[in-house]
Regions:
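Residue-level signal for inorganic ion chemistry
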Residues: 3, 28, 85, 97-98, ...
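Acidic helix N-cap motif at the loop->helix transition within catalytic regions
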Residues: 54-60
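N-terminal glycine-rich phosphate-binding loop and ensuing alpha1 helix
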Residues: 1-53
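Short beta-strand-to-loop acidic/aromatic patch adjacent to the donor-nucleotide binding site
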Residues: 91-101
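Conserved donor nucleotide-binding strand/loop of the catalytic core
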Residues: 64-76
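Active-site nucleotide-sugar/metal-binding loop of Leloir-type enzymes
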Residues: 80-93
């Protein structure tokens, strides 16, 4: 299973979001802990910025409860980092997760793994509730049908070899792994995600995540 933690956190500001602390644990540690707790997860591979491999390996191992953790260097783009992680895995299916989604639950991970069985892959996603517009040159150019739109999350589970085959076909920089499989004409199943499975992108997201965690503790 691949946890991608190689980004530059450019929208987060001067601090690093992966080692930011939310309710007593770092963002990356919470992501790792969820995969450790999920059934059906084998080796966990953390993909880190080349300058931070040892640092993030240590963070991940502290959360791994004795499970095997491998840390590898990522690349300049997301797809390069994902490829490094996928190549470090040996399982038939690989779950790919953004390290900056610390509120993922073991249950969602297990649903995605189960959903991928017999298919090229499965992604977590939630229906879009806002009205979405396509904008070109500062003006609205199209009005997509909201009933057809889902916001993709992670984890995204893919057939390892299919992902590698698709990566070899083009040097594009897809922003998710369902798009990568689409190069081969393969379909991904959609597993309903979790509205609480937010991605930490800006400092305000840490406050939202902390509030969600406090709510979980209250039950």
């Amino acid at each position: 299973m691949v946890i991608v933690a190689a980004g530059a956190s450019t929208r987060f500001g001067a601090a690093d979001k992966l080692t930011a602390v939310v309710e007593g644990a770092t963002v990356l540690a919470r992501s790792v802990a969820a995969f450790v707790a999920a059934r059906g997860v084998g080796r966990i591979v953390v993909v880190a910025h080349p300058n931070r491999v040892e640092e993030l390996r240590a963070v991940a191992r502290d959360a791994a409860a004795g499970r095997e953790i491998l840390a590898v260097a990522g690349g300049a783009r997301r797809r390069d980092s994902v490829e490094a992680g996928v190549r470090a895995c040996t399982s038939r299916y690989v779950a790919i997760h953004d390290g900056a989604r610390p509120l993922v639950t073991p249950a969602l991970i297990e649903r995605c793994l189960a959903g991928a069985e017999g298919h090229a892959g499965a992604i977590a996603a939630i229906p879009v509730t806002d009205t979405v517009k396509e904008v070109r040159g500062g003006t609205v150019s199209a009005h997509p049908d909201r009933s057809l739109l889902w916001a993709a999350q992670t984890p995204q589970v893919v057939l390892r070899q299919a992902w590698l085959d698709a990566a070899g076909m083009s040097d594009g920089d897809e922003t998710d792994d369902a798009a990568m499989l689409s190069r081969l004409g393969l379909e991904c199943r959609v597993v309903e995600g979790d509205i609480e499975n937010i991605k930490i992108t800006r400092p305000l997201d840490l406050e939202v995540a902390a509030a969600i965690l406090r709510g979980r503790e209250r039950g």
